[in-house]
C-alpha cells in the first residue's frame, strides 16, 4: 500500500479564535499524519516571514492547501505577503524556478455571504471561479496542478451539522488528496 501524499496546510486567519467554521475544518486535518498544519498568523505575528524555511516546507510536501477566509475578494494580508515573498523567482518561476512543478494547489475558502451572491447578476457581480482566478494563475505560474477549491459559503451562518459534514468530507479528502474524485 502506498503512502498518502504529504500535505502542507497553510492556514491564514487573522482572527482564528472567532472563526467557528475554520476551527471545525481544521479538526480533521490535525488528525492525519500526512498533514502538516502551518498557522501563518501564529508563526508570523510581526509579518516577518522566514522565506528559506517556508520554501523548504514547500519542497517537502506534495499538496499545498491554502485555507483562509475570503477577504475583499482575496486572502488575508499575511497570506498575500507570504505568496509574494515565498513564491519567488528561483523557486516558483524564472531560472531554476521549477521546484514546485507537478505539486498540487487547493484553496479552501470560507465566505461571509451565500453562494447566490457570487453570480454575474448578484451582489458580487462575479462567480467564485472568477474571484479565485488570481490564485489559479499563481498555481499556473508555479506549474502546479490547480485542484477545484473547497468553498464553505456563508460560513458563520452554517449549522453545526452542516459544518461537521464539510469537515468530515474535508478530512476524508486529506487522507488521500490526489485520488480520483475527492471532495
UniProtKB/Swiss-Prot annotation:
Alphabetical keyword list: Cell inner membrane, Cell membrane, Membrane, NAD, Oxidoreductase
InterPro entries listed in its UniProt record: Flavodoxin_fold (IPR003680), Flavoprotein-like_sf (IPR029039), K_H_efflux_KefG (IPR023947), KefG/KefF (IPR046980)
Record's bilayer topology term: Peripheral membrane protein
Oligomer status and interactors: Interacts with KefB.
Annotated gene: kefG
Designated name of the protein: Glutathione-regulated potassium-efflux system ancillary protein KefG
Family according to the record: Belongs to the NAD(P)H dehydrogenase (quinone) family. KefG subfamily.
Entry EC number(s): 1.6.5.2
Lineage top rank: taxon: Bacteria
Enzyme class: oxidoreductase
